[in-house]
């Protein structure tokens, strides 16, 4: 008989203690709440197993509208942020923009406030009795459109979250090898065709990662739809109403809706990973993209786009700072 191999003793060094601590933290604050929520979604009031909460979600139009509303607003905001942030990142990476460092700081600051603060500031600015609304009405006789509802949520979320896509795409442009772009131009691929044929395919995995972050943040946003959504319900708002209903709270319904939200976001995450993994490119930026100075109308348009977009996005933070020092007594 062969002798048994001696068992390896666990070495309780610093890294082992950190690993065990992180694992316990993960189980307590992530796995346990998920398991608890899953159990509440399938256990009825009598303590038995039931699918009644899920059946109610998929049979009542109220909950169906909330699911569709969350998907609709998340997809719309994601698309708009991609359309806003990608040109901004491209311009600031390839064109010499004055005060580019200050603009990048303002872009980061615009995304750092909580959704409640951003939504509240936009109500104070463009609400029915907002500062900008009254100024345009009293000065030019122009009545500003309503900031509330679906379009208001889209505007507020897009201006707050476009910075996520910008940061991802800016990093991708820094790792882009300019020799590929120069080679395409020497072969006759230039202008808009160069962007769609060469640049976008190279940054697509990173662009999808930024878009995923925006989708997740929008899908989970409670503050903005609650403040300016009015009758436009999303899943986080419905979960809150179910959990703290005046008629009678329902932990089971809130848990079932939360599980559905987790399933939807997980499916979107897996879809993004599948698409991104098929478009992965490995390259070393031996010849990185360098910002060049433009002249004439192109230079004016590039600066105008950057300043206007960043200016609109930073307005809520500026107004909050201004309001905190204003004497209202």
For each predicted feature, which ranges?
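Short, Lys/Arg-rich, polar N-terminal cytosolic tail immediately upstream
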Residues: 1-12
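Alpha-helical transmembrane segments of integral membrane proteins
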Residues: 7, 270-305
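Membrane-water interface segments at the C-terminal ends of transmembrane alpha-helices
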Residues: 11-45, 59-174, 202-222, 256-272, ...
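Glycine/proline-centered hinge or cleavage motifs at structural transition points of membrane proteins
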Residues: 187-189, 201
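Helix-loop-helix hairpin linking two adjacent transmembrane segments in secondary transporters
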Residues: 240-264
């Amino acid at each position: 008989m062969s002798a048994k191999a001696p068992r390896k003793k666990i070495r309780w060094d610093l890294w082992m203690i950190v690993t065990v601590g992180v694992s316990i933290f993960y189980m307590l604050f992530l796995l346990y709440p998920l398991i608890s929520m899953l159990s509440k979604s399938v256990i009825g009031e009598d303590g038995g197993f039931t699918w009644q909460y899920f059946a109610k979600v998929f049979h009542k139009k109220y909950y169906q509208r909330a699911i569709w509303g969350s998907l609709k607003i998340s997809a719309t905001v994601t698309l708009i942020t991609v359309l806003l942030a990608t040109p901004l990142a491209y311009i600031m990476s390839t064109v010499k923009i004055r005060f580019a460092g200050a603009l990048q700081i303002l872009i980061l600051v615009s995304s750092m406030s909580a959704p409640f603060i951003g939504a509240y500031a936009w109500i104070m600015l463009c609400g029915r009795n907002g500062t900008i609304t009254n100024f345009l009405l009293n000065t030019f006789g122009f009545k500003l459109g309503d900031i509330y509802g679906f379009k208001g949520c889209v505007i507020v979320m897009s201006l707050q979250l476009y910075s996520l896509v910008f940061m991802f795409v800016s990093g991708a442009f820094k790792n882009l090898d300019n020799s590929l772009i120069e080679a395409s131009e020497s072969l006759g691929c230039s202008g808009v065709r160069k962007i769609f044929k060469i640049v976008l395919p190279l940054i697509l995995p990173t662009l999808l990662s930024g878009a995923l972050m925006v989708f997740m943040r929008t899908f989970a946003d409670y503050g903005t739809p609650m403040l300016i959504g009015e009758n436009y319900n999303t899943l986080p708002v419905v979960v809150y109403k179910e959990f703290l209903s005046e008629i009678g709270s329902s932990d089971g319904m809130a848990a079932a809706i939360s599980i559905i939200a987790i399933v939807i976001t997980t499916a979107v995450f897996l879809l993004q990973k599948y698409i991104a993994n098929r478009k992965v490119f490995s390259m070393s930026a031996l010849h990185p993209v360098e910002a060049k100075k433009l002249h004439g109308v192109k230079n004016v348009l590039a600066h105008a786009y950057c300043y206007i977009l960043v200016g609109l996005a930073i307005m809520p933070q500026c107004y909050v700072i201004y309001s905190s020092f204003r004497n209202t007594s």
